[in-house]
């Protein structure tokens, strides 16, 4: 991914963050309401989906989000942040995918 695209996407994201903070000053009451068994079951399902072609961006993002939730539920907050960073990376790649379609 080109640095110009990364900077553009970061700028777009920061604009949306500002808008969200203005619109919803109170973000949330807790990190997740999902039960641990649900996270484990869904994570296993998405890992199977993502283990074979065709690969879909939304499926990859679902797996990354569930990995972040799992780490949070296990109390591994550093790992949770790493997984959330991976979610961000997937979202940037999704943004680039859409932009490439717009240019085609």
Which residue ranges define each predicted feature?
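Flexible "arm" and connector segments at domain edges
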Residues: 1-104
